Every structure is written in structure tokens, then in C-alpha cells.
């Protein structure tokens, strides 16, 4: 947080006044992890303060934002445990967003898909659940839906598509993804997402040792240096 409570409220009001359909509070990045892959770039952000006004985000912060935005749907992003999901529901958030910040915050943390079932159980239908985590293929997205997620976020995939082909690239990416989803659902024998359930997903041993680019099987030499 780069300001005090008044700064938080002013920023939230600006978002509401600008017509945003929902407000998201990211709760897992009050401290940044060791991002060693970025060190060689010598990237520096000008006009951005190097220190934050307040590092601690508490459930009082959640209530502060909720009281400020009123009826606008409120999402808490960065939930990774059933315990935090249950507390979020008690605070009447509209959506729990499962995310480990791309796995860049803390080594050896659980993968998002690993925590999904216990969070679904803790939420028990009382709010919506979004999950992210480098999803790029329809099969993996449908696994998350089958395990109880209401939506799968694909920000990184869309950013790659925009970088590759601007708006046309993004449209093409979404069209290909739609085709892949339809084909996968057809092969599963379902006609709507609400027909999916955990029985469609089972454990499997990895076919190779995992690494930071395991999800991208078509990379030259198996990874980007």
C-alpha cells in the first residue's frame, strides 16, 4: 500500500466512479519475493516510491475497502488456504481468487490447483472462486472448473497474444481457446460446464521432472534460458 487509509479510500472511490464492475484487493504481495530472473535486466521504475506506506494488509483493510465501494463486487486475490478462504467468506467477500502470484513470491509453496479442492470445501458455495496459475490449455482450465472453480483467469496468456499480434492476436488466441474447449468438452461427453465435477479428474505421476517451464511442452530445448 503506497498510502494511508485515506489514500486507499480515495483510490477505491476513483475506481468506482470510473465505472469498474468489481474491485480486487491483492493480499499476497505486501512483500515481494526474490525475483532473481529480473536482476540482470537492471529494470528500474521511475516515479514509483521504493517504499510503501504500510506493508501490513489485515482483515480491517478488507472491511475498509468494502465500506468504501458499497455494492460493487469485491474480490480478494492471493488466497491459498482453506482457513483464509473461510475467513474471507465470514467477511462477506463476493469472490475468493486463488493465486500464488505466479509462483514468484515463495519457493516451495503449493500449486494453486493443489489448494483448490480444500478451498472449494471451505467456501461451500457461499461465494465465487477464481483461480489462475499459468493456464494456457483448455484441458487444464476444464480440470479447474471440474474441481470447483467458477472461472479461470488467463491474464498471462492474453498478454502473450497481445504481444504477438496486438488486438488481432488476442482475438485469434481466444478463438483457438474456444475451439479447444468445445472439443475437449465433446470428448468428455458434456455439453455445459456445470456438468463437470471432480470425478473427471484423477491423480497422475509427472512424465518428466518439473521445472519453471513444465507447462509449456513446445518450447525449444524444453525451456527458455
How does the language model describe each region?
Residues 113-225:
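Alpha/beta catalytic cores of nucleotide-metabolism and tRNA/nucleoside-modifying enzymes
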Residues 2-131, 138-160:
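Alpha/beta enzyme core
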Amino acid at each position: 500500500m503506497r498510502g494511508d487509509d485515506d489514500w486507499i479510500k480515495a483510490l477505491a472511490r476513483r475506481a468506482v466512479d470510473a465505472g469498474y464492475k468489481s474491485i480486487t484487493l491483492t493480499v499476497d504481495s505486501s512483500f515481494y519475493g526474490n525475483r532473481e530472473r529480473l536482476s540482470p535486466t537492471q529494470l528500474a521504475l521511475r516515479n514509483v516510491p521504493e517504499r510503501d506506506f504500510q506493508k501490513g494488509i489485515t482483515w480491517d483493510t478488507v472491511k475498509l475497502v468494502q465500506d468504501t465501494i458499497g455494492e460493487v463486487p469485491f474480490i480478494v486475490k492471493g488466497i491459498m488456504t482453506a482457513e483464509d478462504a473461510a475467513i474471507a467468506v465470514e467477511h462477506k467477500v463476493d469472490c475468493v481468487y486463488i493465486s500464488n502470484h505466479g509462483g514468484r513470491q515463495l519457493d516451495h509453496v503449493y500449486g494453486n490447483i493443489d489448494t483448490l479442492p480444500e478451498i472449494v470445501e471451505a467456501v461451500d458455495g457461499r461465494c465465487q472462486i477464481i483461480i489462475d496459475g499459468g493456464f494456457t490449455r483448455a484441458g487444464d482450465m476444464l480440470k479447474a472448473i471440474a474441481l470447483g472453480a467458477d472461472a479461470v483467469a488467463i491474464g498471462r496468456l492474453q498478454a502473450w497474444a497481445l504481444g504477438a499480434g496486438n488486438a488481432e492476436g488476442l482475438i485469434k488466441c481466444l478463438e483457438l481457446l474456444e475451439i479447444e474447449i468445445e472439443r475437449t468438452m465433446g470428448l468428455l461427453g458434456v455439453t455445459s460446464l456445470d456438468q463437470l465435477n471432480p470425478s473427471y479428474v484423477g491423480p497422475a505421476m509427472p512424465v518428466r521432472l518439473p521445472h519453471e517451464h513444465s507447462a509449456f511442452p513446445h518450447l525449444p530445448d524444453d525451456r527458455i534460458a
